[in-house]
């Protein structure tokens, strides 16, 4: 009887000691709205559409992002400007379906789609999670500051022939390579 009483008392004292020691340890829980959450540098959050250094939107409506998306949350319609360049007449992302996998960013040849570390996108209604082009387009170039798709590839620049643009090689006559 005394043995069980001593064992019970020791167990209670040991428990109180552990509680007392844990009271002074660093807390594991973050008080989220007051304390910022640490995100890894490669965190994939909200999708944005960027502009090139000239201020034009980078998206050329190639539709590769919509094809690469495993949940089909991206839809767009191609239009053509007077100078022959393509642009998206509308660009829509349904964030209630998006799994933030980043495949659209990898598929984009112009670096127009980029994922930001913004993760606070909660809404009361699902319809408000469908973002249009005006909601997605930002004013800056995003991660690639000096990249301009039309300076590297695409349509020729007025006043310059083929092979004279920046980082462009002279054209090769493919038929001359045949045996």
UniProtKB/Swiss-Prot annotation:
The UniProt record lists the 4Fe-4S ferredoxin-type domain at: 49-79, 89-118
A molecular-function term among this protein's GO annotations: iron ion binding
Q: Which HAMAP family match?
A: NDH1_NuoI
Catalyzed reactions per annotation: a quinone + NADH + 5 H(+)(in) = a quinol + NAD(+) + 4 H(+)(out)
Q: Which organism is it from?
A: Chromohalobacter salexigens (strain ATCC BAA-138 / DSM 3043 / CIP 106854 / NCIMB 13768 / 1H11)
What Gene3D superfamilies would the database entry show? 3.30.70.3270
Where in or outside the cell is it found? Answer: Cell inner membrane
Alphabetical UniProt keywords? 4Fe-4S, Cell inner membrane, Cell membrane, Iron, Iron-sulfur, Membrane, Metal-binding, NAD, Quinone, Repeat, Translocase, Ubiquinone
The family line of this record is: Belongs to the complex I 23 kDa subunit family.
Residues at which [4Fe-4S] cluster 1 binds: 59, 62, 65, 108
Its main subcellular localisation, reduced to a broad class, is: membrane
Query: Topologically, how does it sit relative to the membrane?
Result: Peripheral membrane protein
Q: Write out the residues that bind [4Fe-4S] cluster 2.
A: 69, 98, 101, 104
Q: Which GO CC terms are listed, alphabetically?
A: plasma membrane
Details of cofactor binding: Binds 2 [4Fe-4S] clusters per subunit.
What this protein is reported to do is described as:
NDH-1 shuttles electrons from NADH, via FMN and iron-sulfur (Fe-S) centers, to quinones in the respiratory chain. The immediate electron acceptor for the enzyme in this species is believed to be ubiquinone. Couples the redox reaction to proton translocation (for every two electrons transferred, four hydrogen ions are translocated across the cytoplasmic membrane), and thus conserves the redox energy in a proton gradient.
Q: Which gene encodes it?
A: nuoI
Record note on quaternary structure:
NDH-1 is composed of 14 different subunits. Subunits NuoA, H, J, K, L, M, N constitute the membrane sector of the complex.
Kindly provide the name given to this protein in its UniProt entry. Answer: NADH-quinone oxidoreductase subunit I
Q: Which cofactor does it need?
A: [4Fe-4S] cluster
- EC number(s) given by UniProt: 7.1.1.-
């Amino acid at each position: 009887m005394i043995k069980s009483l001593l064992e019970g008392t020791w167990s209670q004292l040991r428990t109180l000691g552990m509680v007392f020691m844990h009271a002074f340890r660093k807390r594991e829980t973050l008080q989220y709205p007051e304390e910022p959450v640490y995100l890894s540098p490669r965190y994939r959050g909200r999708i944005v559409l960027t502009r090139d250094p000239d201020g034009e939107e980078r998206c050329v409506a190639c539709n590769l992002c919509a094809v690469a998306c495993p949940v089909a949350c991206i839809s767009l319609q191609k239009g053509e400007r007077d100078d022959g360049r393509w642009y998206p007449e509308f660009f829509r992302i349904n964030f209630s379906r998006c799994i933030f996998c980043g495949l659209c960013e990898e598929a984009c040849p112009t670096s127009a789609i980029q994922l930001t570390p913004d993760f606070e996108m909660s809404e009361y209604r699902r319809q408000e999670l469908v973002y249009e082009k005006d909601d997605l387009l930002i004013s800056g170039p995003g991660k690639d500051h000096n990249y301009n798709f039309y300076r590297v590839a695409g349509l020729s620049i007025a006043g310059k022939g083929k092979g004279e643009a920046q980082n462009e090689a002279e054209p090769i006559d493919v038929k001359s390579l045949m045996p």
